[in-house]
Amino acid sequence: MGCKACGTNCQCSATKCGDNCACSQQCQCSCKNGPKDKCCSTKN
């Protein structure tokens, strides 16, 4: 359940997270392990 940097296909903005992800991962803007636009965590 950790966070990791995503590729260019997975991005999120500070105003909208999750649904804007183009990859099979969900963006976690609240994650502080990386930039808000490149911090993702698996849905599971």
UniProtKB/Swiss-Prot annotation:
Protein task: This protein binds cations of several transition elements. Thought to be involved in metal ion homeostasis.
Coiled-coil annotated spans: none
Protein name: Metallothionein-4
Signal sequence bounds: none
InterPro entries: Metalthion_5
GO BP: cellular detoxification of metal ion; response to copper ion; response to metal ion
Native source organism of the sequence: Drosophila melanogaster
UniProt GO molecular function: metal ion binding
A Pfam cross-reference name: Metallothio_5
